[in-house]
Amino acid sequence: MFGSNISVGNFPTFISAPDDYIQITSWDTGDWNGKVDIGNYVLISPGVRIMAADSVSIGDSCMFGHGASITDADWHGIYDRTKVVGDPRPVVLEENVWIGEDAMICKGVKIGANSIIGARSVVTKDIPKNTIYAGNPAVFIRDLDENEFITREDFFQDPAKLAKDFDLLDRYTLGQNSFLGWIKSMIFRDKSH
């Protein structure tokens, strides 16, 4: 995280890795007072990049796939390449938005509640609520029934079930690990990293 105007709500889930970190930047120097507001129950996967020279607002229960990117600026002028930031415009994601893997959300965009942006899509215009958009540029795919959603907030409402689900996930993820495997990994280190 870089910048002082970054706020994160309750119960966030940030998943990162040494070679695929999350980057959240509020450009709040000089003429710019960028801010990033992240709501409650938000899921941010490895490689996600959120950059604000003006404002990026992320509603409750939003999810970001691996490598998704949001920016509210061009970061340089079109003709004057020495001009930092360019012409920033706020980005707003309403509640329960799902941004697919490697999708890019550009400046000035508002994405309505419950909408889904497909993997590797490029969004340059507002997206209505309860819809799926995908492609480059992103185009309408279909409507969604607003009464069918179970959100990340719902997921966190039963702590006992949540603990059990995470325990099952850990067991599945780590199921092939063993003490002998760990010893081998310490002796015969993988030199490709």
Q: Locations of the language-model features?
A:
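Conserved catalytic-core motifs of eukaryotic protein kinase domains, centered on the activation segment
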Residues: D74-W75, R81-K83, I127, D143-L144
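Glycine-rich NAD(P)-binding loop of Rossmann-like domains
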Residues: D31, K83-N96
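Beta-rich strand-turn-strand
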Residues: R49-A53, D102-S115, S121-T124
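Short glycine/proline- and charge-enriched loop/turn segments
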Residues: G77-V84, F149-D154
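Domain-scale signature associated with acetyltransferase and cell-envelope carbohydrate enzymes
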Residues: M1-T71, E94-E95, A113, K129, ...
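A short, glycine- and basic residue-enriched loop/turn
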Residues: P90-V91, V109, N130
